[in-house]
Structure formats: C-alpha cells, structure tokens
Amino acid sequence: MDDIVKQAMAKWPNVPHCYSWLGLDTRGNWYMRDDRTQAIGSFASGMPGAKGSMLKHEKLIDFIERNYGVDAQGCWYFQNGPQRVYVELEATPFVWRVDAQGAISSSTKQTASLVQVYMDERGWPYLHTSLGFGLVHTQDVASLAEALELWHWPIQEVRAAELPQRFGYQKSPALMEKNK
C-alpha cells in the first residue's frame, strides 16, 4: 500500500466505505460504475452496460493495483486514500497470466507460486497460488496447457458455484453489505 494512502487513512479514519463503483472482470480489466450503470444491474449480471466504463488510464490502474487488498470477510477493495472502495468481481479476485514455462503473475503485476490447479464444469481453469485464488486469463489457456504438461501439475475438479466459499472471497461486497 502506498505511504500517501496510509497517511490519509490515519488522518481521516472514519470515511464511509464505497460499494459498487469499481469492478474487476474476467480478463483483469477494471471498470468504473456510476449510479446510472449500477441501476442497470449488478457488475456480473451480463446486462448490456452494467459493467460500466473500462478504465484505460495506466497510472490510475497502477494506483488501484498497488492499493488492492482484502478484508476479514473476504471482500476485496481498493484503498483510495482514506476511503475503502469495495470491488465487484465478475469471477475471482485475481486473474492469472501464465507462460509456457509455468511462470505465474497476476493482473495486478505480482508474481506468484502455484499451490493447485482447478478446473470447473465449464472448463474454466483457475489457480490457487501463494497470493490467492484466481481465474486464468483466456489468452493464457494454451500456455497453461503447456505448463501442465511440462511440470505435471495435477488438475482438481471444482464446481464454479462453490469457489467463493471454498476460497474465502465475496463476488459482491455490496450484496453482502445490503443483506446485513
């Protein structure tokens, strides 16, 4: 976490949290969601326009990724100065990039080591790593296949609906907050 963010948190400790304004899709892209977008539907609803506007400003994306974390309830957030902005996840908290030699990095540009490979009933591959759990980027499925063969990584089957509970993350912190 950036020092300037830590300083802002200390200076203004009671800023309310923000929900539904930021989303992470299955390809590791960040989306900003205004009130109008949120009214269309949830981030993962599949409704046209519900994701919002994809962020393209590299420095903003880097700032989000440096200050991306998780709370005790498994809700992922971006610490924006003193305000915690909870992230709506289309699938998982991380999107993994994999090369043919088995090197793993997150969409947040952190390297990780493999714990286990999973595949759901749709054929979607996931990795449990030293950093956490996530979906493999669609562009890296072929590289994952090469790494599986090279390193003899075993694949464990899993049901997609069981992933959040099994790996301790919330896809929609806003929904969790609403149901309190």
Segment roles from a protein language model:
Residues 1-55:
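Long alpha-helical, hydrophobic tracts
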Residues 14, 25, 34, 71, ...:
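Acidic surface patches and DE-rich sequence motifs
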Residues 20, 74-76, 115, 125:
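Residue-level detector of beta-strand structural context in well-folded domains
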Residues 23-24, 67-69, 94-96, 114-119:
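Short, exposed beta-strand/loop patches in secreted or surface proteins that constitute
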Residues 29-33, 40-92:
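Short, well-structured hydrophobic secondary-structure segments
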Residues 37-38, 90-95, 140-143:
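A short, sequence-level motif marking secondary-structure junctions
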Residues 89-91, 98-100, 106-108:
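Gly/Ser-rich, low-complexity
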Residues 105-180:
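Glycine-rich, aromatic-bearing surface loops/beta-hairpins
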